[in-house]
């Protein structure tokens, strides 16, 4: 899979504050790539650097294989780091005409196509002040789509929206991916990244915690909890089961972690019995995705 953005060892400080600390990852073409982390984790700073709004103290980034991205390559990138200043009394069409004239991106002929992409074509002549919060944000994304960029960079695209607006924007992001755009978006919402992103990088206090396919990063797991009269003997015979075996001293139990859907309870019970250990407890628990996220960010 081709890479549209490669970030290599990027660091940024503000005085004594280290906003980013040697962050590196690649964004695959055609993905919806989420940069996930709590407030203050460095998400917006990182987007500012790759969009040339901020300068890194260290490291580099490549757009389409070129350091920093040439002016020609930059035309392939649409960006929404903050909401544009639209005129409340003008229509969606007229607001985009002004944006197009100022930015020089695309042509006036592109505006109708952009409005169709963001599902505002039927309201194109309505005044901006009559739009819902979700519609206003869709128009802002439409402004970033002028010139038909290959990549769209969004900073917290659903921030401040009501539930209806959030659903509208998430649906739009998925639709834009299906139309061939690569989406890079910052978010502090685990639920958002789970629902719309194919890949993600998790940041905490400027450090990259993990990156990769969302399904792998946030993989749900089977946790089998066992106990026996002789807990030491149980721990000893279970070392060959699952990918990880832990002793929980507080509960006086042994936990085996399996990939989701692979724990076979009957086999575990039979194995223990065949090895001279009679179980007093055998319980299958599911690790919640939220727990996995907090586990990653708290380690």
How should each PLM-predicted stretch be described?
Residues 1-11, 299:
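ABC-family P-loop ATPase nucleotide-binding domain
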Residues 260-299:
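C-terminal coupling/interaction segments
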Residues 73, 110, 213, 233-237, ...:
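Hydrophobic side chains in well-ordered alpha-helices
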Residues 170-255, 259:
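ABC transporter nucleotide-binding domain
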Residues 5, 12-185, 190-204, 210:
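ABC transporter nucleotide-binding domains
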Residues 128, 251, 285:
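Residue-level "edge-of-site" marker
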């Amino acid at each position: 899979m081709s890479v549209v953005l490669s970030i290599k060892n990027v660091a940024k400080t503000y005085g004594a504050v280290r906003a980013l600390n040697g962050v590196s990852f690649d964004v695959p073409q055609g993905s919806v790539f989420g940069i996930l982390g709590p407030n203050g984790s460095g998400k917006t700073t990182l987007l500012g650097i790759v969009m040339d709004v901020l300068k890194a103290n260290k490291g580099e980034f490549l757009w389409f294989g070129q350091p920093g991205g040439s002016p020609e390559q930059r035309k392939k990138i649409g960006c929404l780091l903050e909401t544009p200043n639209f005129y409340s009394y003008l229509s969606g069409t007229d607001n985009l005409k002004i944006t197009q004239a100022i930015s020089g991106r695309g042509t006036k002929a592109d505006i109708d196509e952009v409005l169709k992409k963001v599902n505002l074509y039927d309201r194109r002549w309505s005044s901006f002040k009559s739009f819902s919060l979700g519609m206003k944000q869709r128009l802002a994304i439409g402004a970033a789509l002028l010139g038909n960029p290959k990549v769209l960079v969004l900073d917290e695209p659903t921030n401040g929206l009501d539930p209806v607006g959030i659903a509208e924007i998430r649906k739009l992001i998925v639709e834009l991916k299906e139309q061939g755009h690569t989406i890079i978006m910052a978010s502090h919402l685990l639920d958002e990244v789970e629902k719309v992103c194919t890949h993600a990088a998790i940041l905490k206090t400027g450090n990259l915690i993990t990156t990769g396919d969302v399904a792998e990063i946030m993989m749900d797991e089977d946790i089998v909890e066992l106990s026996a009269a002789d807990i030491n003997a149980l721990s000893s015979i279970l070392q060959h089961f699952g990918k990880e075996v832990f002793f929980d001293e507080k509960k006086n139990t042994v936990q085996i972690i399996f990939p989701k859907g692979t724990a076979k309870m009957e086999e575990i019970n039979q194995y223990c019995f065949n090895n001279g250990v009679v179980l007093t407890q055998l319980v299958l628990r599911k690790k919640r995705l939220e727990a996995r996220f907090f586990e990653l960010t708290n380690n």
